[in-house]
Amino acid sequence: YCLGKAFRDAEAGRRHNPEFTMLEWYRCDWDEHQLMGEVGELISQLYAAANALGLGRESPPLAIHKTSYTDCFEQVMGVNPHVAPLSDLQQLAVACSSDSWANESRANCLDLLFSQQVEPQLPKGLVLVYDYPACQSALAQVAINGDGHNVSRRFEAFLNGMELANGYFELRDPTEQQRRFDQDLKHRVEASRPAMPVDNKLLAALEQGLPSCAGVALGVDRLLMQLQGVDSITEVMPFSWERC
């Protein structure tokens, strides 16, 4: 595991700070569902401890919900994210954004719709969303779900509507990872976005062999926000972006 500082340029706001604290850990011979259970247990225990100490707002015991990406997306948007035509997703994206989405990829459209439309409708408590669309796999393996759709073997954890953690059943195939890097670079060029350098160290590590494992990254500052019942990330940091 690793507990330490992470940095992300060009993001500052109520839930974002360029410097933040991340807890990341891996479990060998586990899949994403086993790790998802451990994430739920960790957050539940911390939530109960915060309540017992009287931290933050008074709140009831933590409710835990598990749902597939398909179910929560269809419930809010009325379309299946795996089979809806890209043109339909682009039109839905335009409806909730002032920008043009005519040339955006399927992954970007789904990301916008989920963050702007679906996340605000998630139930209170801890929500664990799994089986994301295959186009959003990043570093995760892909499998076929019960409906015959390719899905990403990853999950995200949301506490009271705020994203806290992102986990993967880790991809181990260097050729497939190279293909994904190339595809992402192509989409960035087509969208006139800055090109990102390929992570050759990761590819070299995959060439050497990675054991079967699942990994997750959890935002500690956001978790503290929820445990203490505060509305801004600056309230749980000694030196936020504005005070540096």
Annotate each predicted stretch with a short phrase.
Residues 51-63:
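Short, glycine/acidic-rich hinge or "gate" loops at secondary-structure transitions
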Residues 1-42, 70, 74-244:
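A translation/RNA-centric and nucleic-acid-associated enzymatic feature enriched
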Residues 43-50:
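A common structural junction motif
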